């Protein structure tokens, strides 16, 4: 009888190996994150009512250097004629996109450092919103301190990696119409990312797998694109705004700095860098001249003043609440901030800005013609009261740019597209100008951060740019007119519901969810197979036990293992999987809208809703011209 039984040492070894395999498989399953791991279940200070559907956390983009980008995603509240995702980036370089999320286009605004309120002009009405802190080291993102990026193509490569891994987690969004939006130095980031996406889409493997990303448009406000035209716009802008009188003693210092910049740009002979130290002195001279009794002009809104030398760094007023809120332990826990993030959130990272000084990258203005000709629509908008990235410089570089057989806003040789007056709810709002895939919008009486000043107008601009049409949905369209014409119906502040489009989206989400379950189930299957094999082995031994009285005596080490132990273990695994699936379903598959329960007026029915410390980086890398730090006379293009 003993010849039919495995030797005692083999039995012991099998048990140990089974244990090791189960532990390893369990660890792999636990470490492979899914969408449910990023689901935001509560948000401190949230307004009354159910929470918005959102996900947040880190995604690794550079394993070697521990590079992780932070994202915060808000699901759209309603679906109009098609599904869209807008990715928002702030600038700096090194300034957090939480500025955009909490002070501009996100669904929440801060009342104080512990209370949130709804933003009635939030961009998540008809589009999914994805905010990303990048490059690594910015905001909640992090990396080893010696691995910050230097060039725009490096940044774009990181971002494409981020998107690949984000879509693996959220496959239901991969085939959305994709738009990028942002402001200031994002005028450099976004065109480079767009080019990297178009290059990726040419990859044969991507084409074969039908994983093309449907990049439709770029929407950039008060962007930094072309140093030549934009540096040289400072002097004419201050003259136009009456900030300095021509030929005055105050003007002479600014004019000297302007002349030095012209000479430096001439010496570059077409090889102009994105950042030119000599030309930065023009803005510094303007701020110095404006200094009166310790107060200077706000470079982001020339109607305002600030203490010298901050000159706008303390603006907007919501900023004083932002850092205290985002450093709270309960907030970082809610947003799934990794423990590897050792320091508190800062608006702009001096170390990132000091490192990110592109020497090889050409200005993004050189990329725009190719993007336009490829079919990507581009919208540029300016707040008329911004100095640092003012509208004169933007308009000048547009007028010189050539693409699709024309120059600037030419409709035909010598015939330019007209500037069309825009009114919003009966008030003059600005003007539109369009030609050959490019749209330009000037917002009257607006600052560097247009959505902060006019959230609902900015959302109206977004809906027009995205081509949102609520004709088949219902709701009360906003009274927004260009040259007196209303155009496509869009809605701001009233939240209609989709029927057919919503049903199609539910089917899409259901298919994507089964795909996600299958993917995560591959790892779980390993655990089940191993457990089943172990159960079969012990079942065989139990039968031998019943057939021969010497079985238990020969293998006393197995006496404590009952027939129900492995099933109980497997059931514990299954219960955790069911809980994760329920969380995934709660975050991804809840009904988007409820027609019966909708109340009139603005609704939120689709809501399913650290202490700061000076780092060694900040000591070694003091704030520079591009950094937005209190108490510095810097020129941060946030």
Curated annotation (Swiss-Prot):
Signal peptide segment: 1-32
Keyword DNA damage part of the UniProt annotation: no
InterPro entries documented for this protein: AB_hydrolase_fold (IPR029058), Peptidase_S10 (IPR001563)
Record region (Disordered): 586-638
Active-site residues, record numbering mapped to chain: 184, 386, 448
First-listed, main subcellular location of the protein, grouped into a coarse class: Golgi
Keywords: Apoptosis, Carboxypeptidase, Glycoprotein, Golgi apparatus, Hydrolase, Membrane, Protease, Signal, Transmembrane, Transmembrane helix
Topology Cytoplasmic: residue spans: 541-638
Protein name, entry field: Pheromone-processing carboxypeptidase KEX1
């Amino acid at each position: 009888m003993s010849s039919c039984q495995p030797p005692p040492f083999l039995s012991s070894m099998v048990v140990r190996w089974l244990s090791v395999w189960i532990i390893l498989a369990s660890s792999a399953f636990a470490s492979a994150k899914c969408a449910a791991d990023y689901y935001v279940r509560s948000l401190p200070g949230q307004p009354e009512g159910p929470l918005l559907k959102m996900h947040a956390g880190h995604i690794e983009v550079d394993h070697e250097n521990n590079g992780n980008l932070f994202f915060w995603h808000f699901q759209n509240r309603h679906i109009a004629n098609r599904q869209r995702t807008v990715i928002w980036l702030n600038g700096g370089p090194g300034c957090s996109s939480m500025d955009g999320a909490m002070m501009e286009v996100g669904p929440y605004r801060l009342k104080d450092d512990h209370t949130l309120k709804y933003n009635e002009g939030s961009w998540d009405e008809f589009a999914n919103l994805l905010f990303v802190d990048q490059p690594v080291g910015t905001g909640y993102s992090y990396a080893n301190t010696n691995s910050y990026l230097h060039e725009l193509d490096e940044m774009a490569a990181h971002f494409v990696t981020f998107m690949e891994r984000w879509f693996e987690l959220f496959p239901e969004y991969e085939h959305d119409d994709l738009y990028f939006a942002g402001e200031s130095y994002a005028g450099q980031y976004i065109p480079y990312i767009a080019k990297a996406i178009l290059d990726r889409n040419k990859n044969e493997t991507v084409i074969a797998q039908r994983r093309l990303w449907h990049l439709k448009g770029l929407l950039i406000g008060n962007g930094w694109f072309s140093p030549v035209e934009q540096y040289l716009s400072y002097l004419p802008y201050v003259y136009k705004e009456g900030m300095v009188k021509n030929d005055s003693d105050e003007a002479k210092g600014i004019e000297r700095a302007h002349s030095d910049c012209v000479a430096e740009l001439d010496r570059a002979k077409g090889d102009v860098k994105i950042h030119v130290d000599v030309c930065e002195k023009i803005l510094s001279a303007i701020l110095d001249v404006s200094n009166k009794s310790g107060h200077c002009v706000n470079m982001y809104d020339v109607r305002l003043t600030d203490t010298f030398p901050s000159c706008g760094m303390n603006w907007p007023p919501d900023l004083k609440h932002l850092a205290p809120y985002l450093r709270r332990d309960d907030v970082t826990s809610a947003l799934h901030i990794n423990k590897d993030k050792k320091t508190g959130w800062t608006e702009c990272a001096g170390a990132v800005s000091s490192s990110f000084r592109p020497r090889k990258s050409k200005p993004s203005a050189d990329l725009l013609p190719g993007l336009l000709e490829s079919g990507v629509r581009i919208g540029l908008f300016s707040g008329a009261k911004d100095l640092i990235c003012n509208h004169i410089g933007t308009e000048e570089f547009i007028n010189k740019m050539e693409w699709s057989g024309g120059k600037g806003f030419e409709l035909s040789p010598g015939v330019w597209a007209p500037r069309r007056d825009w009114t919003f709810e009966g008030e003059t709002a600005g003007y539109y100008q369009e030609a050959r895939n490019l749209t330009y919008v000037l917002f009257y009486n607006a600052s560097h951060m247009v959505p902060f000043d006019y959230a609902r107008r900015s959302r109206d601009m977004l809906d027009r740019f995205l081509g949102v049409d609520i004709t088949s949905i219902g709701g009360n369209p906003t009274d927004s007119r260009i040259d007196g014409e209303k155009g496509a119906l869009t809605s701001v502040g009233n939240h209609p519901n989709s029927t057919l489009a919503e049903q199609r989206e539910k089917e899409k989400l259901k298919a994507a969810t089964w795909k996600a379950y299958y993917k995560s189930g591959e790892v779980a299957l390993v655990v089940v197979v191993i457990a089943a094999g172990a159960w079969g082995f012990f079942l065989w031994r139990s039968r031998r036990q019943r057939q021969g009285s010497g079985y238990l005596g020969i293998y006393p080490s197995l006496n404590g293992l009952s027939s129900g132990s492995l099933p109980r273990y497997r059931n514990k695994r299954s219960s955790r999987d069911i809980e994760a699936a329920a969380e995934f379903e709660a975050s991804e598959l809840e009904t988007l809208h409820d027609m019966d329960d909708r109340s009139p007026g603005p609704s939120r029915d689709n809501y399913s809703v650290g202490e700061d410390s000076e780092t060694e980086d900040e000591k070694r890398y003091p704030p520079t011209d591009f950094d937005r730090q209190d108490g510095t006379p810097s020129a941060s293009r946030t």
